[in-house]
Amino acid sequence: MNQSDNLGFFRTKTVFNQLGLYFSVSLGLLLMALPASAHHMMGEKVPTNFFQGFMSGIAHPLIGFDHFAFIFSVGLLAAVQKRGMFISIAFVVASMLGAGAHLATFNLSGVELGVSASVLLFGILLTLKNRPNTATIVGLSAIAGLFHGYAYGESIFGAETTPLLAYLLGFTVIQLVVTMTVFSLSKKFLSGEAQLPIGRSAGLVLSGMGLAFLASAIANVIFPLPKG
């Protein structure tokens, strides 16, 4: 491939990166306009048995687009950082603690803002060539996990012990599955010279989504929707 072809390739890639960013921002705004019940597999109903609890736990991180985007970013960062597996572990453990804090009626303010900001932050981290060390990112992942877990706890608050434990098991399992799948695929494809440009492209998309999520969360704080 000659120099002219290289320039054409990078220009095309830049255009697609920008289009992906603009598209993700628009998509994020549309998704965040959905009602809060979109994060609940059973709407506003509390699970009453093991199966309902487990399936609700699996569904919440998948149908909550802000949660899924962050879990995806955790898997990507874990793949490109040295000893990055600890980033995933810290998030999963902290999310369980966050859910437990909610169930224990501990008050954590700004949960939606924290969840949205975490997507933006990890998207930005993916775009950086010189990232903070793994220990710092592990700490950030744990803090984010507390916010995400606290948000998960809202769906199961008031449930009996069996569906509650099943719910905790469900969202823990699905988070591990998603992060490990992204981690494994990224380890395979994000290697050598491909790591930086592909990682940056993914980071731009996630940053765009995070920005959209955060803008919507701020708007909901300033102009809260009426309940009922």
For each of these PLM feature ranges, what is it?
Residues 75, 79-112, 161-190:
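A small-residue-rich subset of transmembrane alpha-helices
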Residues 38, 64-67, 120, 146-148, ...:
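Divalent metal-coordination and catalytic microenvironments
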Residues 43-50, 106-113, 150-171, 216-227:
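Interfacial helix-loop-helix junctions of multi-pass membrane proteins
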Residues 54, 58, 92-96, 113-116, ...:
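Residue-level signature of the transmembrane alpha-helical core
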Residues 68-78, 126, 137-145, 151-160:
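Generic transmembrane alpha-helix signature in multi-pass membrane proteins
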Residues 199-220:
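Final/C-terminal transmembrane alpha-helix of multipass membrane proteins
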Residues 183-206:
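Interfacial loop-to-transmembrane junctions
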Residues 2-62, 218-228:
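Histidine-/acidic- and/or cysteine-rich, low-complexity loops and terminal segments associated
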